[in-house]
Amino acid sequence: MAYYRDLFTVLDHLSPIIHVNAVSKIEYLVRHIFDVQSISFLPGVSSKAFYYSITKFILTYHSPALIQALYESAETADHELFRNELINHLEEVIYAIGGIPRKQREYDALHQLHMLVSLVRIDSGISTKYDFVYYQNFDGLNRLLGELKISPSRVNLVIDRENETFLAAQKFAFKSVRQANSANSIHVRLADHLCGFVGRMMHALMEDKSIKEDPVSEIERLGENDLVRKRLLSSDWFKLKPEHFELYQIAYRVLVHKQQSYWATMTWSYFDQILVFYTLLRYIASYDRYEDFIKYHPELHAEYYNSACCQELDRAYELFN
C-alpha cells in the first residue's frame, strides 16, 4: 500500500505519457479462426462487435471443452472443431437464459451471434503460431506515437531483458532499441511495477466472486447454475480507509486524467477488463472528499459502480456501429 502510494505520487509529479496494452489473448485466437473479410461483407454486421461478442461469451460461459476446442483449433488449424463447439455452447446458453429478465438483452444478442457464427467463413490459411504478445506491445506504442506526431525514428527504446520482446521491437523503425536490467534502470523498474499494479487490479476485478457468473463444468448442465441473481462487484472494494481513497485519487490522475490520447490504451474489440478498472478509478475519483465518499454504504457504492460500468459499456458499444 505505502509503496504504491509513493509510486503514484512520483508519477503524478513527473506526469509521464503512459501506454497500457490490454489486448485479449482469447480474442487473438478468435480472430485467427474467423475470417474478417467474410464478416465485412455481411450487411449491418460490425466485425468489432462480432469479435467482442464471441470473446465475452467465451470468458463468461467457457467450459473446459470450449477452451480445449479453441486451443486445439489454433494448434491444428482444424477450425471447424471450435466453431462446432461454440455453436453447441451458444445453443445451450440461449436455452438456459430464456425468460430470465436480467439476461434478456444478452439473450437477443446471442441469438444473432449464433446465426453469424454459422454463416461466417472459417479462415483456413492462418498460421498455427499464436504467441502474439510481443508484436502487439509495439503496435500499440507506434499508434500512440503517431497520434502524438512523434516519429519512431526519434525514439530510443529501453525495454526489460526478454529476448522475444527485443526481437519484436527491432521490427519497428525505432532509432534504437536496447535491453536493460530493471534492477539497474529506474525507468524499466517503474514500468514493471506500474504494469504489475494495473494487471493485478484488472485480474482482481474480473475474478471477483460476487461479480462472476458461476463456473461451467459441463455446458449441458448450465441450467443448474444460478443465472437469475444480479451480479455486483463485492462491497469490500468500497470499504476504503482514507489512505486507500487517496491512492485511488492519485492513480486516477496518473492513469486516466493525464492520459487523454486515444491510443493511451491498446485493445482490440474486447475491452471489458480495462474498462471496469478505469471506471472504478473514475467512480471513486468522482468524490472530491473522503467524507463525501463514506456517506454512502458500500453496498450502495457497488450499485452505483455497476451503473457507471453499464453507461461506459453502452458508450463503447456505440463505437461498434
Give the ranges of each region predicted by the language model.
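An N-terminal structural lobe/cap that precedes and organizes the functional/catalytic core
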Residues: 1-23, 29-33
